[in-house]
A protein has these predicted regions:
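Surface-exposed amphipathic alpha-helical tracts and adjacent flexible/coil segments at the periphery
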Residues: 1-166
Length: 166
């Protein structure tokens, strides 16, 4: 998945560059990569994060709820109606975004946002959605469109040369 690779590599490149800058070191390759987006690992395939083993033995490092990607946490459902829901706080959900949540039985359910009007989100399915459920966005349409654009990433390599007449 090209979007996952671009996002993940972009994130780690940014983190490595920050570490190198703090330690006054340089990478072995030449050039600079300029992503046309802000890398965010929660926006592409993601099963959560762990610091497994970094601070000693670790318990509870798995994702017992589902082996699937939940995506980024968007908010908590304030009201669940027959064909829409509202969230307790601000959000940027948009038409075409994929969302998921755990129902009252702990089963993962998913839907696609058909439209957003004012504070109401109209998904294609609302079955099992209740107030208090946490909504995750597992498909950010706008972010993925940015990642898959031909201009989403640029690499620049400095060149130095001398011109002289013959």
């Amino acid at each position: 998945d090209i979007a996952y690779v671009k996002n993940t590599v972009g994130f780690y490149r940014r983190e490595l560059d920050a570490v190198l800058a703090r330690k006054k070191r340089a990478k072995s390759s030449s050039g600079t990569v300029i992503p046309g987006f802000v890398p965010d690992p929660a926006k592409t395939f993601n099963r959560g994060f762990t610091d497994f083993g970094l601070k000693g033995p670790t318990a509870g490092w798995s994702s017992p709820g589902t082996p699937k990607s939940l995506g980024e946490r968007i908010g908590t459902v304030a009201k669940a109606a027959k064909d829409y829901f509202t969230l307790t706080g601000p959000h940027d959900l948009a038409n075409g975004d994929g969302i998921c949540f755990f129902d009252a039985r702990g089963e993962l359910r998913g839907s696609v946002v058909n439209s957003v009007a004012n504070d109401r989100v109209y998904p294609d399915k609302t079955g099992g959605l209740t107030a208090g459920a946490v909504i995750y966005r597992n498909h950010d349409r706008a972010f993925l469109k940015t990642l898959t654009a031909k201009t989403s990433c640029e690499r620049r390599i400095a060149v130095s040369f001398v011109l002289s007449g013959t």
